[in-house]
C-alpha cells in the first residue's frame, strides 16, 4: 500500500524529472522475507511464474542510475505487477491501471453481495466483545510469518463477523487496484473499530483473504481530530482496504 503511494507520489510530485520518470514499481506475491521466491505464500501457491531474480532487477537499476550503463531497464514500463489467480505478470505505465473499470458492489441483508442497489432492507446486527476481538488471520496487519493469503473460514464462522458473498462467478474477474469499503453503521457506544476484508472463496470452500482495512470510529474524518459517536446514530465510514 505504501509502495503504491510512494510510486504515485514520486511520479506526480517529485522535484526532479529523473525522480518522476525513472521510478520503478515491482509488486509480486511474496512476503517481506521471500522476495522473488516461488514458494507458497500463506495457503496459496502461485507457481513458477512468481519466481524472479530480484537482486538482478536491482543491479540493473543501479547500473543504469549510478554507472550510466544501458541495461535496458529504461525501455521497460515503470510498473510490473503479478496478477494472482491468473499467475502472470502485467506491465503498465501508471497506477491505478488506465483500463480499470470501477465497479460498485452493495451489501444486502441475508449476507448477499451484488451490483444491485439495495432497497429498504433491515440492518444487520452483531455484538462486539473487546475482551474477545476478532483475530487477524492472514492479511497485512500481522507478523511476517502469519501475513498473506490465508484461509479465513474459521474467522468467518464467528458470531461477531458479518459475511457478504456474491453468487458463484460464471467467469473470471480480475480485481486489480484500490479497494474502498463505504460502510453505513451505528454503534451502541461512543467509539469502536470497524474492519473489512476482501476474500476470494474457492470452489472447495476456502476463503482466502486478498486485502483488508481497519478504521477507528472516532478518527473517521481525520487522525488529527477525535469525533466520538452518538450511540444509535448512523454514520458513513470509509475503510481503505488497500490495493490488490
Tell where the protein language model's regions lie, with residue ranges.
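Catalytic His-Asp charge-relay segment
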Residues: 1, 23-25, 105, 183
Amino acid at each position: 500500500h505504501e509502495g503504491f503511494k510512494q510510486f504515485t507520489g514520486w511520479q506526480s510530485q517529485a522535484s526532479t524529472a529523473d525522480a518522476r520518470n525513472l521510478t520503478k514499481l515491482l509488486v509480486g506475491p511474496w512476503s517481506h522475507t521471500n522476495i522473488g521466491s516461488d514458494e507458497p505464500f500463506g495457503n496459496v501457491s502461485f507457481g513458477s511464474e512468481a519466481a524472479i531474480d530480484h537482486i538482478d532487477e536491482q543491479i540493473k537499476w543501479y547500473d543504469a542510475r549510478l554507472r550510466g550503463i544501458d541495461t535496458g531497464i529504461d525501455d521497460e514500463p515503470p510498473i510490473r505487477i503479478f496478477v494472482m489467480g491468473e499467475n502472470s505478470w502485467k506491465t503498465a505505465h501508471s497506477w491505478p491501471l488506465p483500463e480499470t473499470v470501477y465497479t460498485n458492489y452493495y451489501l444486502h441483508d441475508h449476507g448477499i453481495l451484488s451490483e444491485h442497489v439495495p432497497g429498504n432492507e433491515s440492518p444487520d446486527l452483531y455484538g462486539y466483545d473487546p475482551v474477545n476481538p476478532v483475530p487477524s488471520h492472514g492479511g497485512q496487519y500481522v507478523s511476517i510469518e502469519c501475513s498473506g493469503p490465508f484461509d479465513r473460514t474459521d474467522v468467518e464462522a464467528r458470531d461477531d463477523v458479518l459475511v457478504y458473498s456474491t453468487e458463484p462467478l460464471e467467469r473470471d474477474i480480475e480485481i486489480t487496484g484500490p479497494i474502498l469499503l463505504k460502510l453505513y453503521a451505528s454503534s451502541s457506544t461512543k467509539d469502536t473499530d470497524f474492519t473489512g476484508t476482501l476474500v476470494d472463496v474457492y470452489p472447495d470452500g476456502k476463503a482466502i483473504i486478498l486485502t483488508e482495512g481497519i478504521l477507528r470510529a472516532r478518527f473517521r474524518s481525520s487522525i488529527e481530530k477525535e469525533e466520538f459517536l452518538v450511540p444509535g446514530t448512523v454514520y458513513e465510514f470509509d475503510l481503505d482496504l488497500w490495493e490488490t
